[in-house]
């Protein structure tokens, strides 16, 4: 009954399933060793946001490639078939588990601000103020992309196959064409889509400026050419032979052009970061550290819920759903004040997720909601905050953007990767076959006089983000779960809730990802997913003083979970993704 109501609430899912089943029924797939892993475990496992990306990853693994090789091949394909969400013009977080070395690391490839950045996105170079409504898209909204440098660094550290091999599936698909995906079609079908996506008219729209129907073959020769150059000449080729000039010309068109320079493009720094880890029940949950605020929120929420163990872990019970919402509010208040790029602000990340501090915050959760919560004061900030007024970061967008993938290879190495253009189709600039991000919108607007804004715009800085690739380990140090989600600011709620469902309630990823969503990503409200069991909580939560909205929530989750000697997994049924795997021959 639960799944029936879910599918009734998501009628477009039928279109997506038809496309997936058509891929599954092809002779090539029928003869392949791949199979769907929602219930049947596989030793090698992949979940991505599109079947062609999952298949590209599996091809690398079948050739003896590493989890990193598979993730790179999947990302290159996602830049084609899910170009609204991620690609070479975006930013990426990657978490990697080396099974032999028992070593966990993460790479930060977020888009960064150019060197010539102004004080804020709405501040022009002469100091005059610009209309915020006009600055969310276009050249000035774009950050220096970091996805390709991250992929190159990951391959240098953990890759096994040759660099050109990883590009073969995406080049072939870009050259020969791919079927218009249902989810991309849905996004392009917004009432103003043709006007808003003028750079993409020839690619995705017909002569009447209508979105090409689902299943229509889409060919992207510019993307194929870009990939061929990078595959043969290496990552630096993306800016060689006049490509950087073409790129800069594209972002300097239109209202308030980008301030990016060629030096910005060619000197992008990938950061290797220590993951942030904390306890939940008998597990150790490891997440992306700042500038991800997602990691801080997820660890705080999980620990606060553990402190409220008397309420159980059933999201269909109003008492627990209320506690989840209140924990989310508390965590959001803290992150808006204290999380920023650690190169520019001393972020008290470990103090914010320490059990003692989180226990204090959990004690604030009452039977009924409070009108508002103030931020806490972790011990690490006592001296730092003296005499200072910190400006809170703005709330993150609730747009259903971004993409998530997870991979486990034959050696047990694993990748969880969240990758984004920020909002769908980012800046709405298409250059060399890929979409450019609009990550500059993630910085805080201009602070008031006397305030310090940790997330303010500064040269060569990373804005905060909700993205939170995650890995979970048991008491023996064995990796048991990995994944993450798309979905804008609501990512933190999607990930937190599904970790509760998989770890506390022992649901499979397939069961967990089909549950209805609850979110407090936007201030002073609780959002419940329309058409799901979560929406039925509205009356009970209203009685507890919550301001409730029942809305569609297209997440974009992807998780893998250990099952015996293999892995089961799922991609979010709200989008086009699939989770497949295979068992290597002895």
Residue ranges and their predicted role:
Residues 286-295, 402, 406, 416-428, ...:
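Glycine-rich phosphate/pyrophosphate-binding beta-alpha loops
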Residues 31-55, 59, 67-240, 245-289, ...:
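Noncatalytic scaffold domains of N-terminal-nucleophile
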């Amino acid at each position: 009954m639960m799944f029936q109501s879910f599918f009734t609430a998501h009628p477009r899912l039928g279109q997506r399933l038809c496309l997936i089943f058509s891929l599954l029924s092809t002779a090539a797939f029928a003869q392949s060793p791949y199979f769907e892993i929602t219930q049947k475990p596989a030793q090698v496992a992949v979940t991505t946001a599109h079947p062609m990306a999952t298949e590209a990853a599996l091809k690398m693994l079948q050739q003896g490639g590493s989890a990193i090789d598979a993730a790179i091949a999947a990302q290159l394909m996602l830049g084609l078939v899910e170009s609204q969400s991620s690609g070479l013009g975006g930013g990426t977080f990657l978490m990697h588990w080396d099974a032999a070395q028992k070593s966990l690391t993460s790479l930060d490839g977020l888009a960064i601000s150019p060197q010539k950045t102004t004080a804020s996105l709405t501040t022009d170079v002469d100091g005059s103020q610009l209309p915020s409504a006009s600055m969310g898209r276009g050249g000035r909204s774009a950050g220096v992309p970091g996805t390709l440098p991250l992929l190159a660094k990951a391959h240098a550290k953990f890759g096994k196959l040759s660099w050109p091999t990883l590009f073969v599936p995406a080049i072939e698909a870009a050259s020969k064409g791919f079927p218009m995906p249902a989810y991309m079609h849905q996004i392009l079908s917004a009432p103003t889509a043709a006007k808003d996506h003028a750079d993409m008219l020839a690619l995705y729209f017909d002569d009447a400026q209508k979105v090409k129907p689902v299943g229509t073959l889409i060919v992207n020769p510019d993307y194929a050419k870009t990939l061929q150059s990078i595959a043969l000449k290496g990552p630096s080729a993306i800016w060689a032979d006049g490509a950087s000039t073409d790129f800069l010309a594209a972002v300097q068109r239109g209202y308030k052009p980008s301030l990016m320079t060629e030096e910005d493009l060619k000197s992008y720094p990938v950061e290797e970061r220590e993951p942030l880890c904390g306890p939940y029940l008998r597990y150790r949950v490891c997440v992306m550290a700042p500038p991800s605020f997602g990691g801080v929120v997820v660890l705080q929420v999980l620990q606060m819920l553990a402190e409220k163990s008397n309420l159980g872990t059933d999201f269909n019970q109003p008492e627990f759903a209320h506690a989840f919402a209140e924990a989310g509010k508390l965590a959001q208040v803290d992150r808006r004040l204290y999380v920023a790029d650690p190169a520019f602000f001393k972020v008290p990340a470990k103090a914010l997720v320490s059990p003692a501090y989180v226990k204090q915050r959990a004690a604030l959760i009452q039977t009924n909601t409070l009108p508002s919560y103030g931020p806490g004061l972790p011990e690490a900030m006592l001296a730092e905050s003296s005499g200072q007024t910190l400006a809170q970061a703005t709330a993150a967008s609730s747009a259903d953007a971004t993409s998530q993938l997870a991979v486990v290879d034959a050696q047990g190495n694993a990748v969880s990767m969240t990758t984004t253009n920020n909002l769908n189709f980012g800046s709405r600039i298409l250059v060399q076959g890929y979409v450019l991000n609009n990550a500059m919108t993630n910085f805080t607007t201009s602070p008031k006089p006397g305030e310090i804004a940790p997330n303010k715009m500064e040269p060569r800085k990373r804005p905060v983000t909700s993205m939170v690739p995650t890995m979970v380990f048991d008491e023996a140090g064995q990796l048991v779960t990995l994944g993450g989600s798309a979905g804008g600011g609501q990512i933190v709620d999607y990930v937190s809730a599904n970790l509760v469902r998989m770890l506390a309630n022992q649901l499979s990823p397939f069961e967990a990802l089909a549950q209805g969503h609850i979110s407090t990503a936007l201030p002073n409200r609780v959002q419940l997913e329309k058409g799901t069991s979560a929406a039925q909580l509205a009356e009970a939560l209203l009685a507890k003083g919550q301001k409730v909205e029942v809305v569609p929530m297209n997440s974009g989750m992807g998780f893998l979970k250990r099952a015996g000697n293999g892995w089961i997994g799922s991609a979010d049924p709200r989008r086009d993704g699939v989770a497949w795997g295979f068992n290597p021959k002895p």
